[in-house]
Every structure is written in structure tokens, then in C-alpha cells.
């Protein structure tokens, strides 16, 4: 691969944990239509992402991208911090 890694899939979420070294937990929210009632309900997914410089804090809004598996549970990496927590 060249100097730039290929960025596959990018999602935006909120950091809910930064206690691990070089790893953050990101909460992804999506809205799905209920099959029977057709009302939109919120569904959540927690993903572990690689934060090389430990720069994220809880509450930050971040963009993460899929990458090769880095550990048993970590296959995402931090792309950008979109908004800092207040």
C-alpha cells in the first residue's frame, strides 16, 4: 500500500469512554423504522477505535474509519475530532 492508507467506511459518533490506553469507545446512533408500527426508533452500537495520541475525551464528537483488525475488538481508527466536549 502507498503512503496513504485506504479509508473504507467512515461513521460519526460520540466518545463514551477514554479509559483505555490508545483506545476509545464510540457510541453510534442510527434511526430505524419499526417493522410493524413504522415509527422511527433509535438503535445504538458501541465500537472500539484506535486513538494513537490519546487526544479524545469523553463527550467528543468524532469521525472514525474502518481499518484492518488491530486487536480482538478493535478494527476502527480515529480520523478526526469534529467537536470537543463542553
Curated annotation (Swiss-Prot):
GO biological process assignments: translation
Keyword rRNA-binding: yes
InterPro entries found in the cross-reference section: NA-bd_OB-fold, Ribosomal_uS17, Ribosomal_uS17_bact/chlr
Domain of life of the organism encoding this protein: Bacteria
A GO CC term assigned to this protein in UniProt: cytosolic small ribosomal subunit
GO MF term list: rRNA binding; structural constituent of ribosome
Disulfide partners: none
UniProt key word Isomerase: no
Record keywords, A-Z: Ribonucleoprotein, Ribosomal protein, RNA-binding, rRNA-binding
Protein function: One of the primary rRNA binding proteins, it binds specifically to the 5'-end of 16S ribosomal RNA.
Family designation: Belongs to the universal ribosomal protein uS17 family.
Assembly description: Part of the 30S ribosomal subunit.
Entry protein name: Small ribosomal subunit protein uS17
Organism: Nitrosococcus oceani (strain ATCC 19707 / BCRC 17464 / JCM 30415 / NCIMB 11848 / C-107)
Gene that specifies this protein: rpsQ
Amino acid at each position: 500500500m502507498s503512503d496513504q492508507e485506504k479509508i473504507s467506511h467512515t461513521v460519526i459518533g460520540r466518545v463514551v469512554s477514554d479509559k483505555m490506553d490508545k483506545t476509545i469507545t464510540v457510541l453510534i446512533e442510527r434511526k430505524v423504522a419499526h417493522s410493524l408500527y413504522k415509527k422511527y426508533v433509535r438503535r445504538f452500537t458501541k465500537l472500539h477505535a484506535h486513538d494513537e495520541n490519546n487526544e479524545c475525551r469523553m463527550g467528543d464528537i468524532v469521525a472514525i474509519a474502518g481499518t484492518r483488525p488491530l486487536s480482538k475488538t478493535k478494527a476502527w481508527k480515529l480520523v478526526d475530532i469534529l467537536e470537543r466536549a463542553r
